[in-house]
């Protein structure tokens, strides 16, 4: 298996610290709002990578944190007149609801920064003791110049960064790029007692501390959105390696942005969507397949039209699954015949190709294409004449390949029939009202999904093609 390591800017053989085990840390949400589709892509991508590693036999210890104390949390809590803890409690609950709806598996542990205050204070104290940090008026800063390899993850040059950072710089800092690892209390802010007075941790130290305490000095994979590469992950490396003298993470994985209608998603452009808004209109399978239809290191463009296209493609897959489920009830032959054994072995090539693509830096886009190829093959060759054993095998294989992607696990019969009957009713109503455009649109939509309508003396019937 090969993974692209941001630290070295190349694909590397994936070799874990302990054979068969993966220690993985993913930067989670700051819990002051509902997560948006850009966050959703990050969560879906690393959920998929975790699932695939488990599919390949690894035991994965998967940690994803909650940032429940920082400037954004304090600002939002003050705006709505709540405490930071109340705000965090509320949006952690909302995160779990949306993540569950998106079929994201629960982490081994979701630590909250505020649960690790004692350990964070110890971490900061150790950095001061080792000469990597200094205190001024209750604030503690990390000295970037003391850490010789600062910038190695993002490819930034410290001297150039310092030149660019001289505007609005805190004059108390020894160098412009030094960053706060402990912040003294300001009026109205939550604070904890420390050797430097009342205060709270900086954002970067929180992740370093939680990773260290839950996974150890060196971890296999550290991951997050590409926007976190600098300064957040760069600063995590500096703090962690300064404290332990050991490599912090072996492999760094970063997922790319989601653009909306070819523009970067932002509230100011009014093109900002939460995952919850999208999940009200589309199933989790649709959103997951859309998020995984491009390579995780490549930006994807989001639009409702693209989601509709993904839904139509997914419907075709589920139509085929539905046909197989029906065949399972209808076929007469129970056991695999000799001539079917060869075909069953041929189907294994799809699994082999799927693994080959996913083993190459988790290429979900190509893996999805292989599932489509498999289903096209099965649609042609698995029929009412096939044995029950072959039909069941093909169904199990499709679900097996869908499982690491978090898709194609539903039983389709009832839900598909109910949805189609509802659309037929809507079309009948449109025809009675002489709304021919809507009636034609519904018919064309069904046809695109492989459903053909037939007028019979008993009324409208539908069949799959």
From Swiss-Prot:
Entries under InterPro entries matching the protein: Cys-tRNA-ligase, Cys-tRNA-synt_Ia_DALR, Cys-tRNA/MSH_ligase, CysS_C, Rossmann-like_a/b/a_fold, tRNA-synt_1_cat_dom, tRNAsynth_Ia_anticodon-bd
GO terms for MF: ATP binding; cysteine-tRNA ligase activity; zinc ion binding
Family according to the record: Belongs to the class-I aminoacyl-tRNA synthetase family.
Protein name as it appears in the record: Cysteine--tRNA ligase
Binding site for Zn(2+): 27, 207, 232, 236
E.C. no: 6.1.1.16
Amino acids binding ATP: 267
Sequence motif: 'KMSKS' region, positions: 264-268
Cofactor note: Binds 1 zinc ion per subunit.
Quaternary context: Monomer.
Organism taxonomic ancestry: Bacteria, Bacillati, Bacillota, Clostridia, Eubacteriales
UniProt short sequence motif 'HIGH' region, positions renumbered to this chain: 29-39
UniProt-annotated location(s): Cytoplasm
Keywords of this entry: Aminoacyl-tRNA synthetase, ATP-binding, Cytoplasm, Ligase, Metal-binding, Nucleotide-binding, Protein biosynthesis, Zinc
Species in which this protein is naturally found: Clostridium botulinum (strain Hall / ATCC 3502 / NCTC 13319 / Type A)
UniProt cofactor(s): Zn(2+)
Reaction equation(s) it catalyzes: tRNA(Cys) + L-cysteine + ATP = L-cysteinyl-tRNA(Cys) + AMP + diphosphate
Predominant location: cytoplasm
One GO process term, biological-process aspect: cysteinyl-tRNA aminoacylation
GO cellular component labels: cytoplasm; cytosol
């Amino acid at each position: 298996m090969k993974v692209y390591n941001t630290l070295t800017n190349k694909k590397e053989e994936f070799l874990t610290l302990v054979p068969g085990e993966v220690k993985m840390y993913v930067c989670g949400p700051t819990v002051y709002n509902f997560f948006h589709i850009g966050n959703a892509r990050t969560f879906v991508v690393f959920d998929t990578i975790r699932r695939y590693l488990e599919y390949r036999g690894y035991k994965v210890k998967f940690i994803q944190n909650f940032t429940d104390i920082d400037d954004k949390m304090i600002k939002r809590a003050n705006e709505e007149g709540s405490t930071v803890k109340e705000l965090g409690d509320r949006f952690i609950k909302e995160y779990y609801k949306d993540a569950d709806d998106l079929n994201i598996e629960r982490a081994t542990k979701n630590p909250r920064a505020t649960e690790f205050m004692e350990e964070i204070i110890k971490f900061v104290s150790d950095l001061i003791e080792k000469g990597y940090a200094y205190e001024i008026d209750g604030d503690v800063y990390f000295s970037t110049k003391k850490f010789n390899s600062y910038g190695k993850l993002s490819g930034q040059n410290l001297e150039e960064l310092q030149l660019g950072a001289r505007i609005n710089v805190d004059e108390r800092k020894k160098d412009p790029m030094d960053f706060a690892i402990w912040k003294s209390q300001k009026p109205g802010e939550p604070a904890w007692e420390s050797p430097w007075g009342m205060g709270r941790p900086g954002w970067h130290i929180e992740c370093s501390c939680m990773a260290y305490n839950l996974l150890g000095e060196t971890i296999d994979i550290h991951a997050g959105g590409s926007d976190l590469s600098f300064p957040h992950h760069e600063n995590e490396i500096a703090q962690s390696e300064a404290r332990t003298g050991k490599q912090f993470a072996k492999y760094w994985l970063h997922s790319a942005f989601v653009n909306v209608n070819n523009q970067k998603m932002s509230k100011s452009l009014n093109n900002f969507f939460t995952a919850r808004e999208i999940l009200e209109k589309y199933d989790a399978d649709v959103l997951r397949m859309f998020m995984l239809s491009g390579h995780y290191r490549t930006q994807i463009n989001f639009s409702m039209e693209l989601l509709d296209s993904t839904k139509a493609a997914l419907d075709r897959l589920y139509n085929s699954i539905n046909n197989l489920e029906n065949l399972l009830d209808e076929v007469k032959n129970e056991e695999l015949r000799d001539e079917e054994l060869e075909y069953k072995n041929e189907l294994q090539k799809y699994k082999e190709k799927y693994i080959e693509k996913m083993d190459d830096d988790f290429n979900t886009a190509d893996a999805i294409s292989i599932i489509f190829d498999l289903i096209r093959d099965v649609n042609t060759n698995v029929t009412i004449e096939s044995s029950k054993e072959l039909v069941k095998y093909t169904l199990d294989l499709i679900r097996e390949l869908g499982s690491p992607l978090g898709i194609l696990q539903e039983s389709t019969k009832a839900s598909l029939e109910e949805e189609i009957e509802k659309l037929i009713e809507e079309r009948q109503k449109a025809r009675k009202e002489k709304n021919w455009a809507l009636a034609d649109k519904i018919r064309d939509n069904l046809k695109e999904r492989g459903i053909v309508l037939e007028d019979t003396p008993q009324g409208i019937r539908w069949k799959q093609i």
